[in-house]
Regions:
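A structural signal for short, well-ordered beta-strand elements
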Residues: 111, 198, 251, 270, ...
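Structured functional modules or segments
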Residues: 255, 266-267
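PDZ-domain C-terminal substructure recognizer with occasional recognition of PDZ-binding tails
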Residues: 211-218, 260-264, 270-276, 282-317
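Acidic- and glycine-rich mobile interface elements
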Residues: 246-255, 273
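Serine-dependent protease modules
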Residues: 2-245, 254, 288, 304, ...
Length: 317
């Protein structure tokens, strides 16, 4: 008689498959992850960094390199390199550094926009000084927002942040969050609580930020000069426009482009250059370098009327 149970995967088989996947990811990602030390011993920052180009460019977290000064990167094979910080962008908590003379195999870059909740992820970094550490978990949530700020008092929300239960600890910042195919889909940035870690996603927006940092050492953003938040649209307007919400202007900075365009408190911005905006993050994503000094048409709900205002953003100071 045939033992039919032999064809049914056992719990051990499932665990072996899980372990095989995590092991495979670790073997492919670990050689590209560095332990990063910045500044003077005992006074600087420490974290992780990930090689993203064959000629030694690394991505890390902006807060890891915020102390400035000299930096070094050490890898699992024992090699160590002096590192130059090329540029940092506190408003995205991303930074780019370059290991002098390094020719290390980079990680493959993935696309966080393709992630699904429940998907396996592997975190690789150097928590608490323990180099080459690997933890695994799942994508616990998508579309989270993480508040950031720079030294000039500007605040911004990093959109589409990845939430994971893969264990993250101090020192993991700047390390890799990889998918099951060993592709970099996030840069670990924050420990929000027990079993709750956050990573900046790798997507079109962050790749543009990294390219700007590699090219210019900084990120240029357009600036309107408003504070605002999401506001539901009246049903009739929502039906007419095909969107449920817009960005209500709560404050207009004196002397700003928004003030020059005659935006008022209480106005609800529903589109910019014919692109619908339903929340602050939508508006924020449109404030790119290409729009600095360019006239943009704002469609605004003012009372019961839709009006069009022209605004010319300046560079975020």
């Amino acid at each position: 008689m045939t033992d039919r149970t032999s064809t049914i995967p056992t719990e051990r088989d499932a665990l072996d498959a899980y372990s095989t996947t995590v092991t495979s990811v670790a073997e492919r990602v670990l050689p590209s992850v560095a332990s990063l030390r910045v500044g003077r011993a005992g006074r600087g920052g420490a974290g992780s960094a990930v090689v993203i180009t064959l000629d030694g460019f690394l991505v890390t977290s902006a807060h890891v390199v915020a102390q400035g000064g000299s930096a070094s990167a050490s890898f699992l094979d024992g090699t160590e390199y002096d590192v130059d910080v090329v540029g940092a962008d506190p408003l995205s908590d991303l930074a780019v550094a370059r290991a002098r003379g390094a020719t290390i195999e980079p990680v493959r870059i993935g696309n966080a926009e393709q992630l699904r909740v429940g998907q396996l992820v592997v975190a690789v970094g150097n928590p608490l000084g323990f180099s080459g550490s690997v933890t695994s978990g799942v994508v616990s949530g998508l579309g989270r927002s993480l508040a950031t700020a720079d030294g000039n008092g500007h605040r911004r929300f990093i959109e589409d942040v990845i939430q994971t239960d893969a264990a993250l600890n101090p020192g993991n910042s700047g390390g890799a969050l990889a998918d099951w195919q060993a592709r970099l889909i996030g840069v670990n940035t924050a420990v929000a609580g027990m079993g709750l870690g956050l990573a900046v996603p790798m997507n079109r927006t962050t790749e543009a930020i990294l390219s700007a940092l590699m090219r210019n050492g900084r990120v240029r953003r357009a600036y309107l000069g408003i504070a605002g938040g999401t506001r539901a649209l009246p049903p009739a307007v929502a039906q007419r426009l095909g969107q449920k919400a817009g960005v209500e202007v709560q404050e207009v900075v004196t002397g700003s482009p928004a003030a020059s365009a005659a935006l008022r408190g209480g106005d609800i911005i529903v589109s910019v250059a014919d692109v619908a905006v339903a929340k602050a993050g939508d508006l924020q994503r449109l404030m790119v370098e290409a729009h600095i000094g360019t006239k943009l048409a704002l469609s605004v709900l003012r009372g019961d009327h839709l009006v069009t205002l022209d605004v010319v953003p300046v560079e975020l100071p």
